[in-house]
């Protein structure tokens, strides 16, 4: 099954889910796909994978880059681009705060603290598409804070998101010279540091991720707060976000709170009618944009994080949503002009063995969702979790290190999955028999 097939497969799957309510049950038994099989312990102690899958480390913290700096830490969201001439570019976020090391001084950046450019931003990793050997590495954006996730655009750029709405006179803002909490755009074709221009019209908040509908040019944005909302940006000029536009928030008819924390406001397989409410004062100097949205009827989401675009739809991870607060995945279906969009609760975890605090999300070559876990416990056991179109979850990989996996993305040919080990930074390339999925399910208690 390929990515396009996910649409057809999910239609029948959602019907079955709505009938059975399989993932809305209060008990802890559930069905799980066998998937790619048992995870094989990694002798290097990094990443357990199913038999037949392998990984290689292509970039690590401290590696020398061509601009004289070294690879920074805290690698997070990431996108993969085809540069042509047999080259790929990975544009990689680094979720650095002012006290972190930048990997070396740089002269062009957005903001400073106490006169020194803050270390967050992006790096480029340019690869040979066949050998996956690194041809170049360099910093491509600087002077930002906590670049968490982002998203690719149809015109070949990476939207990198600051998960930090801080600035002068604000919490954590001592010594800063500018407000932060913006989205920045980095062309995949960049060859060095780009001029950092915040896309102010896309709002100031705890940005997490973004995705662009190629059919309309609309941008969908998540916010990592326990009382967040989902945003939509309508650009004045599709394909040119710098020209400004209109920011809106998602309102689900009759459901002001999608989190399912205090009751089942939306069952798995159920859907609601969506309207989009316009927002004002989107630069939000008091970091109150979500409050403005909620006051206008926008529906609350529990920590909106990963978002991935499909054909006419987007999948959104709510990290701590659900009755067990283990995570939800929503499916937003876009409708033609004059009709209302719809949002459907595709998945809600009832067990840590399904997934526990899903973060980044991507569609795999077989059409399944791949979710990166980011657990908030003293000892973590983070996995990559697959979710098949029938709603069954399975383990794809297990990280053996005490950190998270982030930024999962696939090469344009679908043969390689790239993923980051957050800290200490490692960027991995995973290959294997992506078409060998076993759809058989088992019941787990």
Whereabouts are the PLM-identified features?
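Blade-level signature of beta-propeller repeat domains, shared across WD40, Kelch, NHL, RCC1
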Residues: 409-445
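Beta-propeller domains
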Residues: 46-75, 81-133, 175
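Blade-edge beta-strand/turn elements of extracellular beta-propeller
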Residues: 43-61, 68-69, 128-141, 184-206, ...
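N-terminal secretory signal peptides and thylakoid transit peptides that target proteins
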Residues: 1-14
């Amino acid at each position: 099954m390929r990515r396009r097939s996910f649409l057809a497969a999910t239609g029948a799957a959602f019907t079955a889910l709505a009938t059975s309510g399989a993932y809305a049950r209060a008990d802890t038994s559930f069905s799980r796909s066998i998937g790619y099989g048992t995870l094989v312990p990694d002798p290097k102690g990094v990443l357990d994978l199913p038999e037949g899958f392998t990984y290689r480390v292509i970039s690590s913290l401290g590696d020398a880059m061509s601009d004289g700096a070294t690879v920074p830490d805290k690698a997070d969201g990431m996108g993969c681009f085809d540069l042509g001439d047999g080259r790929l570019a990975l544009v990689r976020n680094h979720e650095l705060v002012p006290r972190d090391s930048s990997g070396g001084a740089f002269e062009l950046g957005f903001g400073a603290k106490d006169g020194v450019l803050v270390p967050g931003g992006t790096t480029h990793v340019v690869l040979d598409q066949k050998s996956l050997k690194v041809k170049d590495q360099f910093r491509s954006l600087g002077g930002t804070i906590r670049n968490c996730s982002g998203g690719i655009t149809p015109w070949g750029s990476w939207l990198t998101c600051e998960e930090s709405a801080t600035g002068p006179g604000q919490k954590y803002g001592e010594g800063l010279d500018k407000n932060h909490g913006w989205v920045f755009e980095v062309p995949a074709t960049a060859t060095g540091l780009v001029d950092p221009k915040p896309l102010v019209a896309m709002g100031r908040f705890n940005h997490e991720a973004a995705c662009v509908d190629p059919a309309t040019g609309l941008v969908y944005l998540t916010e990592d707060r326990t009382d967040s909302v989902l945003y939509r940006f309508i650009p004045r000029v599709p394909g040119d976000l710098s020209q400004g536009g209109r920011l809106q928030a998602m309102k689900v008819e009759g459901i002001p709170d999608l989190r399912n924390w205090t009751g089942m406001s939306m069952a798995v397989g159920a859907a609601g009618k969506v309207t989009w409410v316009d927002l004002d004062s989107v630069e939000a100097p008091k970091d109150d944009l979500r409050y403005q949205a909620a006051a206008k009827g926008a529906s609350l989401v529990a920590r909106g994080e990963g978002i991935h675009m499909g054909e006419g739809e987007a999948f959104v991870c709510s990290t701590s949503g659900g009755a067990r607060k283990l995570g939800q995945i929503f499916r937003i279906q876009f409708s033609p002009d004059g009709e209302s969009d719809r949002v459907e609760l595709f998945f809600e975890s009832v067990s840590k063995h399904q997934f526990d605090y899903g973060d980044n999300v991507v569609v795999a070559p077989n059409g399944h969702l791949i979710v990166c876990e980011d657990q908030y416990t003293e000892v973590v056991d983070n996995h990559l979790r697959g979710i098949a179109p029938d709603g069954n979850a399975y383990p794809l990989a297990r990280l053996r290190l005490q950190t998270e996996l982030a930024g999962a993305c696939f090469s344009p040919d679908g043969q390689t999955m790239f993923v980051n080990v957050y800290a200490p930074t490692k960027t991995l390339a995973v290959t294997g028999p992506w078409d060998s999925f076993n759809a058989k399910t088992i019941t787990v208690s």
